[in-house]
């Protein structure tokens, strides 16, 4: 498929042939869902923790005698039946991550790129270079109509562009190796440089 290549000032800079195997697939929500779940689960801290009966700070002394009080039989105040007692089978620190094959992760990335292309939310620019001035880049981004955009560059991100983009709300930038399904789908517009297209085609073939 062919797509116009533009410069950051909005002028046309030719066109580019995009690989149908990466940008021309029929997007499948089930594949995208599985990859996003894998990403988010791996990112989850899993630090949830409650105190069990053995960890609560109370005496283990029997609170009153076994018989003759008319009350129920009780031992330690740490029992889960008491207020502020230990929690029975509560959450403990653990990893929420699970495995997903490299082949499936690549497939998910191809479907994410195809989803953006099909929705008309894919833009290819000649390069992502700037002199480091936020105001100038913010004006260009506003003129291009990018409100929530992810810019993916080649193997390395241009330092001046990264510095200029750092304080622009809704604009993220990643190198090609950092491209992932969650960040692509999270933003309204996916912006690829020509170097990013080449790197992604080499990585995902």
Curated annotation (Swiss-Prot):
Residues 65-99 are annotated as: Disordered. The keyword Ribosomal protein applies. SUPFAM superfamilies: Ribosomal protein L4. The keyword Ribonucleoprotein applies. Coiled coil: none annotated. One of its GO terms (molecular function) is structural constituent of ribosome. GO terms for biological process: translation. One of its GO terms (cellular component) is ribonucleoprotein complex. Keywords: Ribonucleoprotein, Ribosomal protein, RNA-binding, rRNA-binding. Gene3D superfamilies: 3.40.1370.10. Transmembrane segments: none annotated. InterPro entries: Ribosomal_uL4, Ribosomal_uL4-like, Ribosomal_uL4_dom_sf. One of the primary rRNA binding proteins, this protein initially binds near the 5'-end of the 23S rRNA. It is important during the early stages of 50S assembly. It makes multiple contacts with different domains of the 23S rRNA in the assembled 50S subunit and ribosome. Forms part of the polypeptide exit tunnel. Part of the 50S ribosomal subunit. Belongs to the universal ribosomal protein uL4 family. NCBIfam families: rplD_bact. HAMAP family: Ribosomal_uL4_B (MF_01328_B). This is Large ribosomal subunit protein uL4.
